[in-house]
Amino acid sequence: MDQPAQRSAFAQRPTTTPVAASATARPLAGTGPLQAYGEWVVHLDGSPRSAERLALARRLAEVCGGRVVAMHAVTPIWTELPMSALGDGGAVVLLQQADEERQRAARRVYDAEAQRPGAPLAWSNGPAAEGGGRLMPAPARLAARALYADVVVLGQQDRDDPLTWGVPSDFVPAVVADSGRPALVVPRVGHQETIGRRVLVAWKASRESARALTSALPWLKTAQRVEIARWNEPGWRYGESRPDQHGTPPPSDAWLADWLQAHGITARITHEGDAGADIGELLLSRAADTDADLLVMGCYGHTRAREWLLGGATRTVLQSMTLPVWMAH
């Protein structure tokens, strides 16, 4: 990748030198609402599930008429250990070799997929190798590349696979928050035959839900069935969330239905009763009951000491999900 010229503030006039697009970039060839998703960035970690994520993203990008960019991003093993545990320089060398093997494994996944027909496919080394200085944390590196995409495809964490140990536990929320892009999170087990035909939306009157639902509108426009699930929650900030004593839905249900209808989407809105101890479990149960093949929800959480602390529903879904999840923060 070309690196921008170094210049101090106010020292030079803005450049008008054109920047050439990469060989795999092309005008969108898809039609319909899904054409909005033109560039897909896929996270590879060297694990076998990376191949599933990459193949799925490529299949979806082909439907959208877009392209896929694959990127390997993990935290180097040696940076996670205290200096006392590293001993002499030999230990660092061995750990660096292990990191290099993980990257080679990711590249093998990419090379194998590149041999198959499908949407245009490209490899990115990320900002650390494309003009960066010091080593960036893995989530920040991927988020920096995802800024220039429509969707970032991530995987559910699998602590039983040593090839994913370099993926921080808060990787998904950190990438979603730092990039501002919606994420398609793929389960660590199973194969997705269909996606986006039967959509379940977890709705809460919040910025996170609104952002997730808005970014998922192309999915909803092409879905065969859209269901929106709501739970009665205490401390409601944006109006009444539950039906009244006569069972009449709150006004916000009509607002939501009218907004979706303005986009040509007819959705069934259901009230699931009072929220239990963990809405995440209720949500996954509802997804199974309705045979949903895509769950749309906001990603809730906040940072503390550079680590993401997730809301209960978000944490549960990311831990126990068995279907693809579309998230936005």
Name each model-derived stretch.
Residues 62, 144-147, 177, 218, ...:
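Solvent-exposed polar/charged
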Residues 154-174, 196, 297-319:
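Glycine-rich, Arg-bearing micro-motifs that act as flexible, cationic patches
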Residues 154-157, 180-189, 298, 325-329:
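Short beta-strand elements of ligand-binding domains
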Residues 2-92, 178, 195-272, 292:
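Small/aliphatic-rich secondary-structure junction motif
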Residues 90-105:
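A short acidic, glycine-rich active-site loop
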Residues 108, 115, 122, 162-187, ...:
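P-loop/Walker A phosphate-binding loop and immediately adjacent motor/lid segment at beta-alpha junctions
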